[in-house]
Swiss-Prot record:
Pfam family membership, one: Nup96
Major subcellular site: nucleus
Amino acid composition bias (Basic and acidic residues), ranges on this chain: 525-534
GO cellular component: nuclear envelope; nuclear membrane; nuclear pore; nucleoplasm; nucleus; ribonucleoprotein complex
Gene name tied to this protein: Nup98
UniProt name for this protein: Nuclear pore complex protein Nup98-Nup96
PANTHER family documented for this protein: NUCLEAR PORE COMPLEX PROTEIN NUP98-NUP96, NUCLEOPORIN
Role according to the record: Plays a role in the nuclear pore complex (NPC) assembly and/or maintenance. NUP98 and NUP96 are involved in the bidirectional transport across the NPC. May anchor NUP153 and TPR to the NPC. In cooperation with DHX9, plays a role in transcription and alternative splicing activation of a subset of genes. Involved in the localization of DHX9 in discrete intranuclear foci (GLFG-body).
E.C. designation(s): 3.4.21.-
Catalytic residues identified in the record: 881
Positions of region (FG repeats 2): 214-480
Residue numbers spanned by region FG repeats 1: 1-156
Residue positions, PTM Phosphoserine: 524, 608, 612, 618, 623, 625, 653, 673, 680-681, 839, 888, 934, 1027, 1042, 1059, 1063, 1328
InterPro entries from the UniProt entry: Nucleoporin_S59-like, Nup98_auto-Pept-S59_dom, Nup98_auto-Pept-S59_dom_sf, Nup98_C
Length: 1816
């Protein structure tokens, strides 16, 4: 390979790595300058140079040779091994004559002269690299000349062959204050000088590699193999690769050198590098420095006699594969036939001729087979197959061989083991590379490099690459082929092995069960007991210093995670197979309870931390999670470090709440231990005590999930961060220093708003934690002196406020108030991949939002929303403790949320008089037995504390007396409903239904059924437990405790105790009046062990109770005679306080239920309207109203009238504008859903205006109609037709149009102000005519003002008023007059009313008087008259409306030019009430009149429309969209279309809803038909039809349907479909099918008919009814769209037709053709009747009737076809039909057993008859 051409890409016509090749001469990498190792870089110039030394002239080599070669007759190859060179200087200053690296008698490492690696010390005779004695001292200090120290590696022992002898020494010991010198012994083998350079692990590794696990043979003199498996020989010479040595480099005990020669240098004869015998004295590469030989040549030419590149015979490949005789290069390749061709062609890298790199069938390593890399072969894909593929492929990658050897020579002729040794095979990784490199391995499971796989052992003592060691029975890369066990020269190896074997036998003797913790130390060796107790014993020291599994704890075992020995994916290292490792044969989890008593947890032992690919330090080093971390169970229970020193006075109240067992109480931490507790384990809880402690810590919700356990994000961690970080003191005393927490407002803002008293009261306070969630407190919150670090804890999927209930303030104070909680990152976990499910679609599929809503409801919170994008769960709470998501909620992914009850298995009662067994608590103290507790009570109390599903938000203990009432034995069991109903005189069944409808949740239906379905038997105890959300105080009572309390029970209580699956015998217990024994320490006391829970004490003797029956009270006792008289003020007794009062029950549709006096005017509900309203109420179906007059407790159902009943006139206000709108609209039917658009133009404006003008007088008196009139007349003035311009033929100019619009607008202003002006004039005409004159002026009634001034004698004022409409000069003169009066201060003598008129005439809205007063012309005027003043008097007569509007806007707004002096344009319903715009500061924009908005739109075409169409600008009712919608449609007709789509949708939907509420749903559809989006339009119309289409046919309904279909063009199919939905809701299958057919839903109609109607029709023989449906569905254009028509509907139809045909045949004589046709039909039915689907028993009955009848029809038809001759008088007999014609068809009919037997009887008779006839 290195001596031939390898292709041209790198060097033109030369080879890749050989002569004149890539790294040699004239190539791309080496031109005239030298190669890497033979160039002038080391001191001389050369002509050519190769990387590894081609022919050089006089180079100076690196180690003293001339580039490792000299000019010779032989061609030099890579590394220059084997050529002689001239004199040169070495790198280290020595001179050498003709040396090469490995073949000179004076080479670099074995020369007699001082060389670079040898002149550091003494000198000896000769030297070699790996152990020859040379003239130079070893650089590493040894007296031998080996590079690595000891000569031939014989000085250093391998493993522990030398017996342990503890070195002695002295030390000082202080005892009782006196120092004493003592003698010491180092009880460690590495303290011995023989092993001081190695660690324990290295010694163990060497022992394992030497297979020193059992008896060892005597070593040192045995026959051993060479370095790579060569046969041993004896020699005394040493050398690097060719000298003989007794124990050379790696082949202990052989007489060969490292690479096969026995002389110094490379020219002698003995064995080669890999154990081959050479034929004669050869060099390293089998060539004596330029001499050609003919000897076998291996891959590296090791041990052969060929020259480097000379022809040789029987050369071998790289790894010892014999190949044909051909010119051999370095790797056995032919050197004569190569040409510089493409990369990879010619001869391969390892000696095989190729066709080219990448060509079909060729590979990089010289494969000449026509297969590609990876083709299937006959051998397994592994090293050591019978072929030479790199990964086991048979024909490919032979790596220079063409024989049956593997890729690297591993494992010749194996059966094929895999690359990682998974399959045992003989001869794994076999012989190769000169019969080394893994030769002749024994059978067994092979590892990567061929060694047998021992079982996993200790961490030491393994060989490289997984081999057990050198010179063992297996090989590692060929190191140590089958040899006798070698332990260097230790003669005691055999004895040591015998001792090891004896130890194994002893371990089996004294540990018969293995090393399981369960049976650990059941027996002990008495001989070694004393030895083990000595402190100097290594086992004792190890037990003292090593953390072990086997601690003395109340658990089966603590789960300390050992450090993983490896990080690979394999289960264990194969070096340690067969060893007695520390992993117990019985796993730790074998005798441990699972994580939860409810769940089956299969622990995957292969995935434990020991073998996990990734080692977590927190898991490796952590102590067991269930034991207190550093003496602490839960970190948030510990106190700060400075408080832990006060152990004597420490208050254990908080700790004792969680730990009743003193063993489990937390140990006070030291400052050192606090910092090291963060990395805590999150291992699975699987011990009894851990389970109990975990259950004891439940206060509503357990620790959320393992990811959010108390260990990883503990509250104490947050406190430590607070203590470690200094913070400034907040002025309000607020503390918040935990990392990640924030507040809104921020802490700095809170400091700013703190008042002088140091109080901080903030509104809408929010505290959150980044990435976890937040809490929003609405309203004012007092944060003074709140330590938020201790109070608020937001963690993953849960939030805790006030951990300690003792420190929690009352509800409403502090942070214990209503709040909105947002928890982020709340996603479920996929049980398969353990990844979070974040896909919204998948979350919707598993109904995760519904699950969160159920969890919220279960916790007493109000669910708001769930955002799957961020995993945000938002809910509201009324007060605080702990909320969140628990494990059991997460585990409900795959199961429906149906409550399943748990069956209690209790121990049988002991016999009477038997002593009660004392129960032991965890701390070992005997607990007094409960007094006569029943097993249900005992178990129920325990399960409450243990069950993970129990939610206790209130954290209140269970009342003592909650389980103590009993049912009298002699009394028949009566349900609670019967008790209540009997006392009230109500039907118990009705009360039961009402109660279920009122109080049950949807998810509690199943639990309710279970609860009420179980009636306590006679003598059976009924116990209850209060719901955690509704703590009910249960008191003693001699009466039976009614089961109605179950309505308030939790699902757990109902599902557990009242289990329908529990037998009556199991639930039957003696009566008891004792109270449950609840530990007084806390509600979370540790329960008793599970084994003692079922220990039932003997019942106590009871006193027989007297049975008293129920006595019904005939009527209500008068209050004076009642025992409650005068006690109604006793607040502490809720039964007496307000005892005669009653609550009011609100029902739907404003229905009021009360037992007091009836309200006035609401008697109609007592009669007929109750039944009508039952569809909203408690009962499922309308029922007849039963009078309750026989009971003194009358319940009145009354409907409150919040407003007066709508009159027909009121509906006209809705219908008339809509009719006008429909008149001016166009219906487009281009699509399925019609679209209505307004007609362009202003005609609809005039119609609206005319309608309000012509309305009756009482109509116009309505405020809403008045405002409508103003609006429509204003629209008419602004956009309507101008009568003055209608007669003109030409288009008027813009000036004329503006002037006419001004006049029309002026008329509108005058008209709107007229009523107010008349009222003011009538009031002031006599007393103050000047004010009346001003009122006339505000309405532009100048003539009336002049007349009034003259009448009052004010002629000069009348003269001025007459000039008001004159030129501007009049205003200027009046202004001069006012200025003169002001200068002379004469205005103080003129009345203000007159000055106001003068200022108005002068055009001054505000005039300043001399007495520091001012006259405001616009004061006390509404906005329309103010605007009129600006238009008429303050602006020129030619000014436009827009200019007047702009001036008015400046008047009511504060502008830099001046202050405001006019009122704002408030809506008409706000005018005169004193409301100003300033009161609307909170809104985004001020509230203004719709008329003002219309004027703004007229002035600015792009004015915002949503302000104009807001209902509040029109009426005080914000939901009245009547005028708003009509205005929008008018503006659309005027081409104002810039309203946003959202606002338009709100407008249309709101108006449609308003019409729907008034009963005008058909007009609501008209409104919906204006929606532009066709999809939304169709959806809205269909939903509206579904809500309001009724099944009853009335003239009113017909009129509405005709209006929809004829005027609005709504498809009639939509109406029919809506009726079908209504019929389905009312369970009217007939009408549903009828309307489905009319709606065109053929398939649904067919399915409904077949499933619900066909069977009844067949059974009742109502064939015409069924035929009507089926014949309508039968046409091909319909039946082709129906699924299963051929096997369902058509079968019924053919059956009916056959019956009709038979009736016709029976009545009229028929022809033979008709009989044949009928026969065909009948026989076809016989085959198809069985295909009819049957859903219930009724369907099967109908099918059976059809089969029976078809059988009869078949007999009749066959009898008619085979009738006797006409000459005979006999009639056809169906019983005499030939059997051959009848039997095949009868057998196919699906008849029940009785029908089938009857038919069989008939067929048998026919058969016998035929036999009889045939025999005759």
């Amino acid at each position: 390979m290195f001596n031939k051409s390898f292709g041209t890409p790198f060097g033109g016509s030369t080879g890749g790595f050989g002569t004149t090749s890539t790294f040699g001469q004239n190539t791309g990498f080496g031109t005239t300058s030298g190669g890497a190792f033979g160039t002038s870089a080391f001191g001389s110039s050369n002509n050519t140079g190769g990387l590894f030394g081609n022919s050089q002239t006089k180079p100076g080599g690196l180690f003293g040779t001339s580039s490792f070669s000299q000019p010779a007759t032989s061609t030099s190859t890579g590394f220059g091994f084997g050529t002689s060179t001239g004199t040169s200087n070495s790198l280290f200053g020595t001179a050498s004559t003709g040396t090469s690296l490995f073949s000179s008698q004076n080479n670099a490492f074995a020369q007699n002269k001082p060389t670079g690696f040898g002149n550091f010390g003494t000198s000896t005779s000769s030297g070699g690299l790996f152990g020859t004695t040379n003239t130079t001292s070893n650089p590493f200090g040894s007296t031998s000349g080996s590079l690595f120290g000891p000569s031939s590696f014989t000085a250093a022992p391998t493993g522990t062959t030398i017996k342990f002898n503890p070195p002695t020494g002295t030390d000082t010991m202080v005892k009782a204050g006196v120092s004493t010198n003592i003698s010491t012994k180092h009880q460690c083998i590495t303290a011995m000088k023989e092993y001081e350079s190695k660690s324990l692990e290295e010694l163990r590794l060497e022992d394992y590699q030497a297979n020193r696990k059992g008896p060892q043979n005597q070593v040192g003199g045995g026959t051993t193999a060479g370095l790579f498996g060569s046969s041993p020989a004896t020699s005394s010479a040493t050398g690097l690769f060719s000298s003989s040595t007794t124990n050379s480099a790696f082949s202990y005990g052989q007489n060969k050198t490292a690479f096969g020669t026995s002389t110094t240098g490379f020219g002698t004869n003995p064995g080669g590098l890999f154990g081959q015998q050479n034929q004669q004295t050869t060099s390293l590469f089998s060539k004596p420095f330029g001499q050609a030989t003919t000897t076998p040549n291996t891959g590296f030419s090791f041990g052969n006699t060929s020259t480097l590149g000379q022809p040789s015979t029987n050369t071998m490949g790289l790894f010892g594969v014999t190949q044909a005789s051909q010119p051999g290069g370095l790797f056995g390749t032919a050197t004569n036939t190569s040409t510089g061709t493409a990369f990879g062609t010619g001869t391969g890298l390892f000696g095989q001729p190729n066709t080219g790199f990448g060509a079909v069938g060729s590979t990089l390593f010289g494969n000449n087979k026509l297969t590609t890399f990876g083709t299937s072969t006959t051998s397994a894909p592994s090293f050591g197959t019978t072929s030479g593929g790199l990964f086991g492929n048979k024909p490919t990658l032979t790596l220079g061989t063409n024989t049956n050897t593997s890729n690297f020579g591993f494992g010749t002729n194996n059966s094929g083991s895999s690359i990682f040794g998974s399959k045992p095979a003989a001869g794994t990784l076999g012989t190769g590379l000169g019969t080394g490199f893994g030769t002749a391995l024994g059978a067994g499971q092979a590892s990567l490099f061929g060694n047998n796989q021992p079982k996993i052992g200790g961490p030491l003592g393994t060989g490289a690459f997984g081999a057990p060691g050198f010179n063992t029975s297996t090989a590692i890369l060929g190191f140590g082929a089958p040899q006798a066990p070698v332990a260097l020269t230790d003669p005691n190896a055999s004895a040591a092995q015998q001792a090891v074997l004896q130890q194994h036998l002893n371990s089996l003797t004294y540990s018969p069960f293995g090393d399981s913790p369960l049976f650990r130390n059941p027996m002990s060796d008495p001989k070694k007991k004393e030895e083990r107790l000595k402190p100097t014993n290594p086992a004792a020291q190890k037990a003292l210093t090593t953390p072990t599994h086997y601690k003395l704890t109340p658990r089966p075992a603590t789960r300390v995670r050992p450090k993983a020995l490896q990080t690979t994916g394999t289960a264990k290292s194969h070096l340690f197979d067969g060893l007695d490792d520390d992993e117990p044969s019985l796993a730790n989890g074998a005798f441990m309870p699972k994580k939860s008593i409810k769940k089956l947890v299969l622990k995957n032992l292969n995935n434990s931390n020991l073998f996990s690919p990734v080692n977590h330090d927190s898991e490796d080093l952590a102590s067991p999670s269930e034991y207190p971390e550093n003496g602490e169970r839960f970190s948030f229970l510990s106190k700060p470090v400075d408080e832990n020193n006060q152990q004597d006075g420490e208050d254990d109240s908080l700790v004792s709440r969680f730990y009743t067992n003193p063993i489990a109480k937390p140990i006070p931490q030291t400052p050192e231990s606090v910092g090291n507790k963060n990395n805590s384990s999150s291992n699975v809880e699987d011990t009894i005590v851990a389970l109990n402690m975990r259950a004891a810590l439940r206060n509503g919700l357990e620790g959320s999930s393992e990811e959010t356990s108390f260990h990883d994000e503990s509250l104490q961690d947050d406190r430590e961060e607070i203590e470690n970080n200094a913070y400034h003191i907040h002025p309000a005393g607020i503390v918040l220093t935990k990392v990640g927490y924030y507040t809104i407002p921020s802490m700095d803002d809170l400091a700013k708003i703190t008042n002088e008293k140091g109080e901080c009261i903030v509104s809408d306070f929010t505290i959150g934690r980044k990435g976890y969630g937040s809490i929003y407190f609405e309203g004012d919150v007092n944060l003074t002196n709140l330590n938020l670090d201790d109070i608020v804890h937001i963690r993953r999927k849960e939030v805790i406020v006030y951990v300690d209930d003792n420190q929690k303030p009352p509800v409403g104070e502090g942070l214990n108030r209503k709040a909105e909680v947002t928890l982020d990152g709340v996603w479920p976990t996929d049980k398969t991949s353990r990844c979070l499910i974040k896909s919204p679609d998948r979350l919707a599929d598993i109904n995760y939002e519904g699950r969160l809503e159920a969890v919220s409801r279960k916790q007493g919170a109000q669910f708001k929303e769930y955002r799957p994008e961020t995993g945000s769960w938002v809910f509201k709470v009324s007060h605080f403790s702990k909320y969140g998501l628990q494990d059991s909620d997460e585990e409900e992914e795959e199961h429906p949320p149906k409550t399943t009850s748990k069956k209690l298995k209790t121990a049988p009662l002991p016999p009477a008089g038997q002593a009660t067994t004392f129960q032991m608590t965890l701390n070992g103290k005997p607990a007094p037995p409960p007094q006569s507790q029943s097993p249900e009570v005992e178990q129920l109390g325990r399960v409450v504390e243990l069950d993970s599903d129990m939610v206790d938000i209130t954290q209140e203990p269970v009342p003592d007396s909650v389980l103590e009432e009993s049912v009298p034995e002699d009394q028949e069991p009566v349900s609670a409903s019967t008790h209540i109903a009997s006392s009230l005189g109500i039907n118990p069944h009705v009360l039961q239904i009402m109660k279920a409808s009122l109080l049950v949740d949807e998810e509690d239906v199943d639990a309710m059924d279970q609860r009420f379905g179980h009636i306590p038997s006679k003598g059976e105890t009924v116990q209850e437990i209060c719901s955690p959300r509704l703590p009910i105080s249960a008191s003693h009572s001699s009466k039976s405790r009614s089961i109605v309390g179950g309505l308030l029970q939790s699902k757990f209580a109902s599902g557990t105790f009242l289990s329908p699956s529990a037998s009556v015998q199991e639930c039957r217990t003696p009566r008891t009046s004792s109270r449950m024994n609840i530990p007084s320490t806390s509600p979370w006391s540790v329960p008793l062990p599970l084994a003692t829970v079922f220990t039932v004490p003997s019942p106590a003797p009871e006193v027989q109770l007297k049975t008293v029956g129920i006595r019904r009270q005939p009527g209500l006792v008068p209050l004076e005679k009642s025992i409650t008289y005068g006690k109604g003020k006793l607040l502490m007794d809720m039964a007496l306080f307000m005892g005669r009062s009653f609550r009011v029950g609100w029902g739907p549709n404003w229905t009021l239920a009360n037992s007091g006096e009836q309200l006035h005017g609401s008697h109609e509900l007592e009669n007929h309207q109750v039944a009508d309203s039952m569809e909203y109420g408690f009962l499922p179906n309308p029922v007849a109203v039963k009078s309750l007059s026989e009971s003194p407790f009358k319940v009145h159902l009354e409907k409150l009238g919040l407003r007066q009943r709508k009159l027909d006139e009121d509906l006209q206000l809705y219908q008339t504008p809509l009719e006008l709108k429909l008149k001016h609209s166009t219906v487009h039917v281009d699509e399925l859903c019609p679209l209505i658009v307004p007609n362009p133009g202003v005609s609809v404006i005039h119609d609206y205006a005319d309608w309000v003008k012509d309305s009756p007088g009482d109509f116009l008196e309505l405020p809403i109609v008045k405002h409508w009139s103003l609006t429509w007349t204003l629209c008419e003035a602004l956009w309507g037709h101008l009568k003055e311009l209608d007669g003109q033929l030409d288009e008027p100019s813009e000036y004329i149009q503006t002037l006419e619009r001004r006049r029309a607008f002026s008329r509108w202003l005058s008209h709107t102000a007229a009523p107010q002006i008349e009222e003011e004039v009538s009031l002031t005409r006599r007393d103050s005519p000047v004010e009346a004159v001003f009122s006339y002026l505000t309405g532009s009634r100048i003539s009336g003002a002049c007349c009034l001034a003259q009448q009052s004698g004010d002629h000069r004022l009348a003269l001025l008023l007459s000039q008001l409409v004159g030129s501007q000069s009049v205003r200027e003169l009046l202004t001069m007059q006012l200025a003169d009066w002001h200068q002379l201060q004469a205005d103080s003598f003129i009345h203000d009313e007159r000055l106001r008129i003068f200022a108005l005439l002068a055009g001054k809205p505000v005039w300043q008087l001399s007495e520091q007063k001012q006259i405001n012309v616009c004061s006390q005027l509404d906005w329309k008259r103010t605007l009129a003043i600006h238009l008429w008097y303050l602006l020129p007569p030619t000014a436009s409306i827009s200019r007047a509007l702009s001036m008015y806007e400046e008047a009511f707004q504060n502008t830099p030019e001046g202050d405001k002096y006019a009122c704002s344009p408030l809506p008409s319903y706000l005018e005169g009430c004193g409301c100003m715009v300033e009161e609307e500061k909170d809104s985004r924009r001020p509230l203004q009149d719709v008329c003002f908005h219309l004027l703004k739109l007229y002035s600015d075409r792009h004015y915002e429309l949503n302000q104009l169409l807001e209902p509040r600008s029109i009426t005080a009712d914000p939901l009245d969209y009547r005028l708003s919608w009509h205005l929008w449609e008018v503006l659309r007709a005027l081409n104002y279309t810039h309203l946003s789509e959202q606002c338009e949708g709100v407008l249309q939907a709101s108006y449609a809803g308003q019409l729907e509420s008034e009963g005008l749903w058909e007009w609501a559809i008209f409104v919906f038909l204006h929606i532009d989006n066709s999809g939304m339009r169709e959806k809205a119309v269909r939903e509206l039809l579904t809500r309001h289409c009724q099944l009853s046919e009335t003239p009113e309904s017909w009129a509405k349907e005709a209006f929809l279909t004829q005027k609005l063009c709504v498809p009639a199919e939509w109406i029919h479909e809506a009726k079908a939905v209504r019929a389905h809701m009312e369970s009217n299958k007939h009408l549903e099918a009828l309307y489905l057919f009319k709606a065109g839903h053929w398939n649904r109609c067919h399915k409904l008919v077949i499933r619900h109607l066909a069977s009844d029709a067949i059974i009742n023989e109502n064939y015409d009814y069924l035929k009507g449906f089926l014949e309508d569905l039968a046409p091909p254009e319909r039946s082709s769209l129906i699924q299963d028509w051929e096997t369902s509907g058509l079968v019924y139809l053919d059956y009916i037709r056959v019956i009709e045909m038979l009736h016709r045949i029976q009545q009229v004589d028929c022809s033979g053709y008709e009989l044949e046709h009928l026969h065909t039909k009948v026989t076809s039915l016989c085959n198809r009747i069985e295909q009819i689907p049957c859903y219930n028993a009724k369907d099967r009955l109908a099918q059976s009737d059809m089969a029976k009848r078809v059988a009869n029809l078949l007999r009749v038809v066959l009898s008619l076809q085979h009738a006797p001759d006409a000459t005979s008088n006999s009639t056809p007999d169906p019983q005499r039909v030939p059997l051959r014609l009848l039997a095949p068809h009868i057998g196919r009919l699906p008849m029940p057993e009785d029908y089938a037997l009857e038919e069989l009887r008939g067929l048998t008779q026919s058969y016998l008859r035929e036999l009889t006839v045939g025999s005759q």
